[in-house]
């Protein structure tokens, strides 16, 4: 059933079109009160032309967005050391900084960029004056145990921003023990009524850079969802006059229609192992949740009642689904065990709760919570039931969690149009990614790539 998109639905093949370097502009809307101070010193550049990317700026922005770190502004840095031997440890500890990144960039004869960088424990360096010694083969040698890592990489200009995100991931993991999610992407739908193809599915780096158009249509596109390997997107298209579910290979442009049952086909979501899709169909009347085996095409009905059941999301262990249902009168979030069909209600605080997702560690439920203040993102501890409202934006919807569980991207209203917003999982850091050429909806954060 594989075929190329026709007429009104165009896939941009092999070399996907670069829409803009940063069509989504990230704007910080709320700072961090108690995040860990860190110094990301501007890298020394030993060249004649400007660097293609300011590596230290990308790294500092990444770490700030995590909500866990507060990079020292360059204007407040007491010095700009380019390697660990130049660090004045007392000057940095007086600022409350316990960790510092320093580095330099040179260019080799091939035109490639050689990046040397070090992450330094400033407090340890202060204690030892950077001159600690350790016994090695019966000899006392300089250990430099204040250097947490010392790395060298050779890259080309087009990969420089990508590698800056890689450095951010390394720092994040070194200091938190958790994997960083800065080398990831987001997919989203842009709607521009003035465009010949007003509905566009785009993919960008998580921070909005390197945006690329992968699909465009004259009819609505909805609900993009990543496969676990990051190579495919499931989505809903109205190209043929009704909602149908497709899957698209974002590298080859191949797409395949998966379901076209009467009435509604929607809300696709890949299982953690990538072998199944959870979907919503209304072929028997009300909205019901099914799973579709992607190899055998076997369809299994999960919910069976007269209420509307939608927005399925897989528990990380793949053994249950959470979903939104109006079986109690108003939308609330429930959990169904796939082995025996037993169902339990998860949400009780707020008049409505919908759009639920579970963090990768299984600890928290992220959802859209309706209260007297409107529709806002909230986090519920699945063990204690405690609920924390994370946002104060307007008409929040479609939350999507980073693969490490540290951030959430979602759609909200700003300046009377849909934009993408971002909030750290603890609610301390908030940012907005407004599009310059349309309304942006239905974000989906990729898996680790």
Curated annotation (Swiss-Prot):
Pfam families: PD40 (PF07676), TolB_N (PF04052). One of its GO terms (cellular component) is periplasmic space. It is found in: Periplasm. InterPro entries: 6-blade_b-propeller_TolB-like, PD40, Tol-Pal_TolB, TolB_N. Residues 1-22 form the signal peptide. GO terms for biological process: cell division; protein import. Keywords: Cell cycle, Cell division, Periplasm, Signal. Its main location: periplasm. It comes from the Bacteria. Part of the Tol-Pal system, which plays a role in outer membrane invagination during cell division and is important for maintaining outer membrane integrity. Belongs to the TolB family. The Tol-Pal system is composed of five core proteins: the inner membrane proteins TolA, TolQ and TolR, the periplasmic protein TolB and the outer membrane protein Pal. They form a network linking the inner and outer membranes and the peptidoglycan layer. This is Tol-Pal system protein TolB. It comes from Vibrio vulnificus (strain YJ016).
